[in-house]
Structure formats: structure tokens, C-alpha cells
Amino acid sequence: MNKIALVTGAAGGVGRAVVARLAAQGWQLIVTSRQAEHLTAAFGDQHLQVAADCSTVAGARQILQAAKDHQMVPTALAHCVGNIRLGAMHRMSEADFNDCLSANLISAFHTLSAFVGALREARSPGAAVLVSSAAARIGTPNHEAVAAAKAGLEGLVRGAAASYAANGIRINAVAPGIMETPAAAGIIASPAAREGAARQYPLPGIGTPDELAELMVWLLSDSAARVTGQVWSLDGGFSSIRPLVK
């Protein structure tokens, strides 16, 4: 039986890394982005490519319907959609806050709902992994919007994991610190900013999409068959221990 996975936000840094690892393991892939040209640029004519906005009910359902039209029922979901909107809450516009919620929380809810619905219709078990953030786990200045969105995502993971465990559907999340991705490029644009960001972690450094993808793909695998409702930190100890100040 073919292994079929759905990767949302597939043209981004984390999405591409997840796609590469799953493809190397022989998975058939459904890859999504809001812009078709981004998918073409990232993957050429590989994989089933679906341009859709998964932050809407219609967009999320469109993705799963496209899979069904190609006789594909994904049993794994890697939801890699998200953005970073920084700024103290008294200075953040309503539009930026809503955009942050839409990209990081609402898209996760609608995509996970459509994915679970497809699995239940097929009477199939499955696994999903979503991307949270260290900002949901520890207070960080100017991260109010993304912290609220990602904390909501973590609650979604735990609630959905409880609801669908009896169906054999596992749902987990990963919570990275800052990584080498287009979304974070502005934060670490200068050498000084990069060094400052790297030093804030007890294990200093900037994370890579590939190391996060490795953890995500493991959570989707049979090796994690008894893991559900968990949020796995990959943040150099940022959210759990203090760095040694020298």
C-alpha cells in the first residue's frame, strides 16, 4: 500500500525540508501553497500540487477533494503554514494580528479538520504534526501575537488528539526556536542580530529546517506509534532552562 502524505506550506523552508525527507522515504506527496507558482518553483512537475488557502474551510476542503479526485487519501499531515508578526500589542494593527491568527491558528484548525474528516470517511488511522513555537511556551518581548496564535495551536493539538485517539489518529506538534527560514530572515538579517539571537539559547545557534523536518517525519512514522497529544520542543533549551550568562 502506498504511503501518502499531505504537506501544507510546502514551498516554505520547513515545508521543503519535510517534503524532501518524506520523498526520500518513498512517500507519495500532496503539496500545497496559496500560490501555484511557488509550488512549481520548488518542485517542478513533481508531486500532486494544489494551490489553495487552507485558512478557509473551502480552501482546506479543496485540498482534500483534489487528493480524493486523484484516488489519494493522505494518512500523514505535516502542517507547515505560518508567519511571524512581531511587535508590542499596543502597536500592532488589527490587520497584522488577524493575519497572524489566520496563518498560524485558523489554518491549522481547518486543515486538521479536513484531514481528520477524510481519514474518518476512509476508516483509516493516520498521523498529523503541526508547527508551534517556543514563543508559545515562554514569554518573549514583542511576540504577543504569535505567542497567542501558537498557544492556541497547542491547545488544538491536545484537544484533537483526545477526540480522535479512538480512531487511531495521532496528533502532535513541534515547537522550534528561531530557524533559518524566509519567515525569520528579517529577524537575523545583520551579523549582530544573528549573533544576539544565537546567544539567547542555552545550546547556542540558529536552528535549521532540516533538523526540524527530521523530528516531524519521525512523529509521522510508525516509530512514534504511541505518541500523541504532545508538543516537542526543539529550541536549544530556550523554553525550559536558563542560558549560562558569561
Give, region by region, the residue ranges found by the protein language model:
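Conserved glycine-rich cofactor-binding loop
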Residues: A11-G12
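Substrate-binding pocket helix/loop in short-chain dehydrogenase/reductase
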Residues: A88-M89, S93-L101, A197
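Active-site helix of classical SDR
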Residues: L112, A149, V157
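Alpha-helical segment proximal to the catalytic Tyr-Lys
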Residues: G117, A162-A166, A225
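Residue(s) in the substrate-gating loop at a strand-loop-helix junction
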Residues: S133
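C-terminal helical subdomain
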Residues: A173, A192-V227, L234-G236
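Short C-terminal tail/terminal secondary-structure segment
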Residues: T228-K246
